[in-house]
Each structure stands twice: as structure tokens, then as C-alpha cells.
């Protein structure tokens, strides 16, 4: 056991985590040169296209160190994006140490900080690594000082390497073996294994990634899931070298995969503890704290026949993604679907894209909203995650919106632009600290503004230099209103949005104008209105198509023309009473972009 090292790699987006893992796999001979490819651990097509890591992946390698010993390295590559920070915390729970990778050109960024603090809270040994020293812009001395100044760990003798060229990666491994402590645990004790992650394989059923804390797990053992008490047979187990390799046993301190032929998706929840049925452990390991979704949106299949397939797909996806929340929802405009909760807009986009790709579904998304806390006049507190669930105006005593605490790191040159943006987003500054030429800003900004397009606009005002990390702080009373959209006097529930009263007029007008361009013209006038309660705040009309009924009159008497026009008018009136309007899919997407283009 003293030769096992469990660690994960944490860093900001694009600081080279996945490339460094490629090099480590290559040096330790996990894959032959023929099988080696860039970002070998990003197995999803989506990850490769966007160049980001979404799922954490684990690998077991053997490394012969300079002291002649052979060490078993279990390492986990983690995502860097703020929406996937829960993936990072789950991976860290399985480790004793972490490599903090910092780009020697860019320096410390917000995510570096957030992930590093997560690691320190879990008492992990953090080993700083300066990557990309082959770049002409690299300044390792300055960055080492920055790490010490901002993060607070000693980085004077931090390992310097370039994952792209392979320089210094050997030193990284040596430092790992030296600085990261071996796992603790009792190999003879009753089995306790933590489920770090699980996913669904169409042939094997549920595959779980586990870390053995105490005891030993052998092939063919009867294992018990501690939260549900159900027992399963350990059919196959093994390690990833990144390929799946079968083993006969997993020993104390190791990380590996396990297949128990579990058909039910909820059979082995992430964060649960496995133990042996015949010699169970007394208590479960502390799991992970459940992450609360921050953004909710309705997802509906375009054709209602896909509803069953959509439900199964969501079930399989939620096994792989512990933070996805969903419940059935029906809408008069869109039929049956699900209300889904996500950690942020990127997460929402990724989930929607994965559903469309991996499960071949066509989906419509409604506008994303956040959760509001509503105190009704009867003093009851309810949580509202969709505009249609908001009680009537006269029943609301107080409406509170979620406030996010946003930590931003940015160069001084962009400070003015960023502050202007934060104020426009109704933000309140709580802290500002200068570190060299970097500024650490802390703002409290309403979550609704953060999830709309704050991240994109922060990046564009600061030319991509600012970085953001945000978390939910509290609920705060605020003057929010629901803007309904009426089409020919009928409310369309899927188009409603909740917004601040100050912005409501603009938002309403903008939405109505957008809808006007998207709804095809019919034989009668279509009135599109935005309303708060019964008060109409904006209106536009899609004009009718009409035939020229006067074309056949030659010269002709004025009364003859009037008669024909009058007849046409009456026909249109009758048509309007019975006609209904088909809304194209673009109309629903229009709301997603309200408040974005005109800035």
C-alpha cells in the first residue's frame, strides 16, 4: 500500500490538464504509441469538439521511480469549467493529493483558486506545477509569486514543465511520488468502497468507478449498497489503463471499476458506500454534499411520440451526471416534457446536446429561470422554478430572488469595464483586492442575471482575460414580476418570463418585437402582447395577408368597391374567431436571447 499514490489534476480551463495527463500516460506506458492520441481521456465526441473536459476520467499506471521502487499511480483528470466543479469535488474525495496546474503565461485564474480551496478543505496535499514553459510569453518567476500571493501555497520550487513538448514531466512524477502521501486504511478490515462515479453501459448495465478505503474486494464477492441495503454479485472488476482491464481483486487504497449487473439506474448512487454482505462495515463513508441546481428550464420533445424515449434517456444521463434534476411537466403549448435543473448554462447546453446526439432526440427548450423563494399572503414559503408556478400577484406577500456571490480575477486594465457590467447587472460590490497587476473582485449579483449571459459578456468586456467563479449566497427580497405573452388574447404558458420590474418594459417590448418577426403571417391579424398581470406593457401586430378584391372592378362605382371590401372584412372577422396560431420552434428560442443582442 505504501507504493500507491492517488491524485487528481486540477486547473483552470485550458491550462493543460488533459495534455499533461496524456504525457503521464505515455511515460508510464499505459498505451502504446500507436494508440496514443491527443486528449486520450476526453472520450465523448462533444468533449473533443469543444476542447473541454466534461466528465472526470480515471487511470491506473505503474511508474518506476528513480529510487528503484515501482509505484502504482491512480489519477483522475478533472474538468476546469465552473459548471462542472461538482465533478472536481467528487474526484478529489478519492485522492490524497492534487496537482495544481497553472499556465506559466496566464497565471492564476478564478477556477484555479476555487478548485484549490476545494482540495485544501478536503486536506489534500497540493503540488503546484507550472505548465507551458515552452511558450515565449511564459514567466514562471512571476507566476510562482502569484501562486504564493493569491493562493497561499509555497511555489518557490514548483516543478516546471511543458506538457506539450514533454519537458519536465518526469520531474512532475518524481515530485508526486515524494510529496503525496500514500493512502491510509486497513486492508484486513471490513470492506468500505466509495462510489465516485457511475455510468450506464448498454451491455454491462451500471458500471461504477470505486475507491477502496478499507478491506479488499474480490471477484465474485457479494456486495451490499449501504444506503439501499440491496446486495449484488461483483461480476467483473478491474482498472483503467485507460483501457478497461479485468483484475481478480481490488486492494485497499486502489481505484477501479466494478460491474454488478445492476439493471436499475438508481441501484448504485454516486457518493454511496459498498461493503461485503457477509461482513458489513458498521457505518458508511461520508459521501458528497448534494449540489442544488441553479438554473431550470423545460425540455420538451418536438414530437410527443418521443416522450418515452426521452424519459429513459434522462434516466440514463442522470446516472452519469449526479447534478441533473428532472421532474415531469406539461404545457398547453408544448405538450408533455420535463422540467430540468442544471448547474449553469454551459451544463444545460451540454446536456441538451448529449440528449440530441447520444439518444437521437429533437428537443425544444423553454427560457432558463432560476429558483425564486415566494412568501404567500398566508405566510407559507414556496420555491418556484418556473414562471407558470408563480402564484397570482395578489397572493404574494414577498418575492425573493437568489443572489450569487461572484469572485472575479482580472487584469487592472479592464477593471472599469467589468465594474460597469456588474452594476448594469444589478450587482453590489463587497470586496476588491489588488495582487500585483491582477484585481480580485467580489460582487453579489442576482443569479438570474448571472445565468442569462453574464459569463459571455464578462469575457467580451475583458477580452477573455477575466475569469469567474460563482456560488449561491442567499435569497433576497426583490421587485420581480412575471411577464406573460398573449397571442390573440390567449396566454402562452411556455413564453412567460420572470424579470425585474425595472427591466420589464424593455424585456417585454423586445420579446414582442422578436416574436413579430418569427410568427408567419396568417389570413387574419395576430396581436402579440406582453402583460404584467392584466396591464399590457407592449404590443405588436403581425399583419394579415389579404387578397386584392378590387382587382376585378373596372372603373366601377365606389359603393360597389365598398361592398366588396366590407364583405372581405366580415370574412376575416369570422376567421379570426375560429382561427388558431401555430407557433414555430424559433419563437420559443427567441426568449433565450432576449436582453442579449441589443447590448
Curated annotation (Swiss-Prot):
Q: Does the keyword Transcription apply?
A: no
Q: Where is GTP annotated to bind?
A: 14-19, 131-134
Query: Enzyme group, top EC level?
Result: hydrolase
Key word Hydrolase present in the record? Answer: yes
Q: Which GO terms describe its cellular component?
A: plasma membrane
The protein's superkingdom reads Bacteria
EC number(s) reported in the record: 3.6.5.n1
Q: Which UniProt keywords apply?
A: Cell inner membrane, Cell membrane, GTP-binding, Hydrolase, Membrane, Nucleotide-binding, Protein biosynthesis
Family annotation (PANTHER family): TRANSLATION FACTOR GUF1 HOMOLOG, CHLOROPLASTIC, TRANSLATION FACTOR GUF1-RELATED
> What protein name does the entry list?
Elongation factor 4
Amino acid at each position: 500500500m505504501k507504493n500507491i499514490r492517488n491524485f487528481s489534476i486540477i486547473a483552470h480551463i485550458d491550462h493543460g490538464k488533459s495534455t499533461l495527463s496524456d504525457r503521464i500516460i505515455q511515460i508510464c506506458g499505459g498505451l502504446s504509441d500507436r494508440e496514443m492520441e491527443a486528449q486520450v481521456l476526453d472520450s465523448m465526441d462533444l468533449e473533443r469538439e469543444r476542447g473541454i473536459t466534461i466528465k472526470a476520467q480515471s487511470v491506473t499506471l505503474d511508474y518506476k521511480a528513480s529510487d528503484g521502487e515501482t509505484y502504482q499511480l491512480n489519477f483522475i483528470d478533472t474538468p476546469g469549467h465552473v459548471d462542472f466543479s461538482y465533478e472536481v469535488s467528487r474526484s478529489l474525495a478519492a485522492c490524497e493529493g492534487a496537482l495544481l496546474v497553472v499556465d506559466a503565461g496566464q497565471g492564476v485564474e478564478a477556477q484555479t483558486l476555487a478548485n484549490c480551496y476545494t482540495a485544501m478543505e478536503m486536506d489534500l496535499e497540493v503540488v503546484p506545477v507550472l505548465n507551458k514553459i515552452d511558450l515565449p510569453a511564459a514567466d514562471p518567476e512571476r507566476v510562482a509569486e502569484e501562486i504564493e500571493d493569491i493562493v497561499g501555497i509555497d511555489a518557490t520550487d514548483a516543478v516546471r514543465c511543458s506538457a506539450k513538448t514533454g519537458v519536465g514531466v518526469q520531474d512532475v512524477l518524481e515530485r508526486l511520488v515524494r510529496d503525496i502521501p500514500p493512502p491510509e486504511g486497513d486492508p484486513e478490515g471490513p470492506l468500505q468502497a466509495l462510489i465516485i462515479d457511475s455510468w450506464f453501459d448498454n451491455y454491462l448495465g451500471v458500471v461504477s468507478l470505486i475507491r477502496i478505503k478499507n478491506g479488499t474486494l474480490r471477484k465474485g464477492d457479494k456486495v451490499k449498497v449501504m444506503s439501499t441495503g440491496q446486495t449484488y454479485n461483483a461480476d467483473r472488476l478491474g482498472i483503467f489503463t485507460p483501457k478497461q482491464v479485468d483484475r481478480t481483486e481490488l486492494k485497499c487504497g486502489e481505484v477501479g471499476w466494478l460491474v454488478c449487473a445492476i439493471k436499475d439506474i438508481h441501484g448504485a448512487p454516486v457518493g454511496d458506500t459498498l461493503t461485503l454482505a457477509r461482513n458489513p462495515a458498521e457505518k458508511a463513508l461520508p459521501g458528497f454534499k448534494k449540489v442544488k441546481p441553479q438554473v431550470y428550464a423545460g425540455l420538451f420533445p418536438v414530437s410527443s411520440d418521443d416522450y418515452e424515449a426521452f424519459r429513459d434517456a434522462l434516466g440514463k444521463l442522470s446516472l452519469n451526471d449526479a447534478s441533473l434534476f428532472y421532474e415531469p411537466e406539461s404545457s398547453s403549448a408544448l405538450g408533455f416534457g420535463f422540467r430540468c435543473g442544471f448547474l449553469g448554462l454551459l451544463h444545460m447546453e451540454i446536456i441538451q446536446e448529449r440528449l440530441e446526439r447520444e439518444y437521437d432526440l429533437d428537443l425544444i427548450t423553454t427560457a432558463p429561470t432560476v429558483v425564486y423563494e415566494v412568501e404567500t399572503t398566508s405566510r407559507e414559503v414556496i420555491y418556484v422554478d418556473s414562471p407558470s408556478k408563480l402564484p397570482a400577484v395578489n397572493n404574494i406577500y414577498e418575492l425573493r430572488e437568489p443572489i450569487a456571490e461572484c469572485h472575479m480575477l482580472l487584469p487592472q486594465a479592464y477593471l472599469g469595464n467589468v465594474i460597469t457590467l456588474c452594476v448594469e447587472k444589478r450587482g453590489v460590490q463587497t470586496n476588491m483586492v489588488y495582487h500585483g497587476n491582477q484585481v480580485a473582485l467580489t460582487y453579489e449579483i442576482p443569479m438570474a442575471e448571472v445565468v442569462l449571459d453574464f459569463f459571455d459578456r464578462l469575457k467580451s468586456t475583458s477580452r477573455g482575460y477575466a475569469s469567474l467563479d460563482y456560488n449561491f449566497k442567499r435569497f433576497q427580497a426583490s421587485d420581480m414580476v412575471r411577464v406573460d405573452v398573449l397571442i390573440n388574447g390567449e396566454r402562452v404558458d411556455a413564453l412567460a418570463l420572470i424579470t425585474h420590474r425595472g427591466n420589464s418594459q424593455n424585456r417585454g417590448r423586445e420579446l414582442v418585437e422578436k416574436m413579430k418577426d418569427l410568427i408567419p403571417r396568417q389570413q387574419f391579424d395576430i396581436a402579440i402582447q406582453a402583460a404584467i398581470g392584466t396591464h399590457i406593457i407592449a404590443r405588436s401586430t403581425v399583419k394579415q395577408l389579404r387578397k386584392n378584391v378590387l382587382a376585378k372592378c373596372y372603373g366601377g362605382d365606389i359603393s360597389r368597391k365598398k361592398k366588396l371590401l366590407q364583405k372581405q372584412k366580415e370574412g376575416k372577422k369570422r376567421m379570426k374567431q375560429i382561427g388558431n396560431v401555430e407557433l414555430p420552434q424559433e419563437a420559443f428560442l427567441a426568449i433565450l436571447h432576449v436582453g442579449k443582442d441589443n447590448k
